[in-house]
Amino acid sequence: MKGYYHISSHGLEKNDIFKKKEDFVAGMNDIAICVLGFDVIILCFCLMSNHFHFVLYGTMSECRRFSEEYKRRCAMRMKLAGGEVQGMRGVEVKIAFVDCQEYLENVIAYVLRNPLAAGILLLPYHYPWSSAALYFNGGIQQTGESLNEMSERKRFRILKSRVPVPDSYLVDGQGMILPSCYVDSKAVEQVFRHPSRFMMSLARKIENDVEIQLGVAEQVSMTDQEILTQLGDLIRNEFQKESISELSMEQRIRLCLLMKRNFRAGIKQIARITRLDPETVAKVV
């Protein structure tokens, strides 16, 4: 039986899936290729540096197969790009059935709000590695070059695959297949019915509600690098110091609590950044 499903990968703690722009572009293209092999419809998605989210329509088995294939492609790319041996091995990919209209609206907003919740100072519509810009946009058509009109060599250089693609697949100037080619934006517009309702959902802070329902409230949502970019301001505001090395042991203990609360950082992640023993951090948080 077909239905709506939320796919979410557990955040990597020691590495990133997408480290640079080229990785994100490849990750977006992987979505476009993966969806061709399964009987699923993509309503929305968001790629973060260390995890990903999708809301799909299909059977549970097809949605699961799609998510596992996408995870496999991510792992292959990580290994080829940096020699990462572990890649995505052991990374849990959750699949949750969306059982009502309210939950569907909330989980779509949750997926598209991910960058904002992670402290990235962009409206969801302007985050380039998600489908947020596709909805209620007045029918603006994205333009690009047709993949099927390219030479075979150029096409393979972009896709890293020889899989046949529809004539509707267009590529932008950075070699990325336009999300409008493979995301069913009209289905999402039918869910929300009006742009004001969609905007209100994106404006609400719904992370706790959705994560409790998903059972992933303890999931790491930020990488070490993302935390470190904000940690300096936190230390200056709370302790009037410039770096962790200037903090006393008592202040480092308090910093553990602040990192847990502000960044939802895990025990091992806090220990790495503060250079405290994981057992000490566990007792504190």
Please name every model-derived segment.
Residues 1-44, 59-285:
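Short Pro-Cys-Gly-centered "Cys-loop" motif that presents a nucleophilic cysteine in a tight turn
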Residues 47:
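Active-site nucleotide-donor binding segment shared across nucleotidyl transfer reactions
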Residues 50-58:
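Short beta-strand->loop micro-motif that forms the acidic, two-metal-ion catalytic signature
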